[in-house]
Structure formats: C-alpha cells, structure tokens
C-alpha cells in the first residue's frame, strides 16, 4: 500500500518514531533536519520509483509508524521546515543512530574504501552514562556453531571465533570463524552483528538492566572472549551502526546548551544547513 503525503507531514510522524519526543528541543530539531535530509536524498535518488514510492516505512529508510504527531516533535519539524544538511550545495546522507560507544564511525564500517567527505569519526563522551553505552552478553557455543552452518553453509564443529580486523574508530569489521572443515571471514558491520546475534540470550546494560537479545548485536564495537565448546562473551558499547549523529549524544549536548546547528556540525564535517524550495 502506498501512502502519499507532504514531506513535512511525513516528518511529523517520522521524528517521534525515531527519537523520543521527551528529548531536548535542539536535539529534536537536529533529528528533524537529519530525517528531512535523509528523505530528500532518497527522493532524489528514486530507489523505490518503480513502486511509485520515495521511501518505505522500515529501518531500511526511516521508521514511519503513522502515529499521532507529538507536540514537541511537530514543533521541531515546523521550526526547521525545509532545512537540510548539504555539502557543496548537495544533500548528504545524514545518518544517525541511537547511542555511541564513546566514538562515532564513518561509512568505512560498511566497506567504503574512502569515507564520504561529510562523515567523520569523533569522540562522543556526551552519552557515556547512557545504559547502552556499555553492555555484555554471552552466546552459547552451539548457537554460533548452528549459525555458522545456517548462514555460511559451514560444516563440522566450530573451533574458534576471533576479531580479525577493526577500523580506525575501533569497530569490528572482520570476524574470523574457524571450523574443522575450513575457515571463513564475516565482514561489514551488519553481517557481523547478525552472525553474533544475541537472540535467545540476555544482554546486561551499563546500569545492570537485563534485556532480551534481538536479531542484531547492539553494535560492532565489542571485545570477544571465547570459551571453545562452551560460549563466547561479548563486551561492548553503543547501540546502532555508529555512523553520523548519536541521538542520545545529541540530547545530552542540547541539555548542555548546544544548538541544533552546533550539534550537527559536531557530528558531520564541512556541512551547511540550506533551505529547500519546498
């Protein structure tokens, strides 16, 4: 089903779907600019044009839950109406994610040979006290052995799992998996988080809260301690892919008096906020 509506109306549902409406106003405005930029760029690229659509309503693009607009987020959308992030007059990929591990990454985490010129890796201590800034989970050895068979088609017993490569910001970009019938490498942020999915396990957050694991490891920022034949313990930090703006970081920055523009300039490199034609 295709739902056709004005971009600004769409954003009034996207922003509260992506960021809690209780966050600070300047953080909400930064989120609105990022969300508008992201949608604007997808519209330009026309990836879903064959379906008569500009974006879908999933995390593949931006979460659009068709919920009732919230006053705070709607105000953030209206106060930034038409504003997008650009570099050299062209809209950028304004990525954002939930919580940092203390540093952000570039798109090299997805295999880019050179980072996009508007993305940079920055220290981010603003969200260091957030529950997801540090976490730990334990995955049974037999679970990973089964996953190696299902995802990679590997056969035989699992012998070892280890980090083989990290990027400049410390994210794991290569995971070496050894089996009795051969070895293989898991690469890129998403595939690594999927292979090490903590589904069926508990995750302990920094504040001691325990939550059920999901389809993806919280982030690719982790250390691994293997107990062959028993389990692997993953100790990491952050929630999400880690590229672009940290949403909880933006909220804490706003609490400290940073403006929307200052927040965006912190997370992105050599950008300007421009007004679209409508």
PLM feature segments, named:
Residues 1-278:
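Conserved, single-site charged/polar hotspot
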């Amino acid at each position: 089903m295709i739902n056709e509506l004005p971009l600004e109306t769409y954003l009034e549902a996207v922003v509260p779907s992506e960021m809690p409406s209780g966050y600070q106003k300047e953080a909400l405005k930064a989120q609105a600019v990022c969300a508008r930029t992201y949608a604007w760029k997808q519209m330009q690229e026309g990836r879903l044009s064959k379906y008569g659509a500009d974006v879908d309503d999933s995390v593949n693009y931006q979460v659009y839950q068709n919920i009732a607009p919230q006053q705070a987020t709607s105000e953030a959308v209206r106060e930034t109406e038409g504003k997008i992030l650009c570099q050299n007059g062209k809209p950028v990929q304004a990525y954002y994610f939930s919580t940092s591990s203390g540093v952000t990454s570039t798109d090299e985490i997805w295999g880019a040979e050179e980072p996009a010129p508007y993305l940079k890796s920055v220290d981010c201590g603003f969200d260091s006290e957030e529950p997801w800034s540090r976490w730990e989970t334990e995955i049974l050895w037999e679970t990973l052995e089964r996953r190696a068979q299902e995802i990679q088609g590997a056969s035989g017993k699992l012998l070892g799992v280890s980090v083989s490569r990290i990027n400049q910001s410390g994210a794991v970009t290569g995971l070496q998996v050894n089996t009795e019938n051969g070895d293989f490498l898991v690469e890129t942020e998403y595939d690594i988080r999927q292979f090490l999915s903590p589904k069926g396990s508990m995750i302990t957050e920094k504040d001691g809260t325990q939550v059920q694991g999901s389809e993806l490891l919280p982030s690719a920022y982790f250390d691994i301690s293997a107990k062959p034949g028993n389990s692997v313990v993953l100790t990491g930090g952050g929630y999400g892919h880690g590229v672009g703006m940290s949403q909880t970081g933006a909220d804490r920055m706003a609490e400290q008096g940073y403006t929307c523009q200052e927040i965006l300039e912190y997370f992105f490199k050599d950008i300007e906020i421009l007004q679209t034609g409508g």
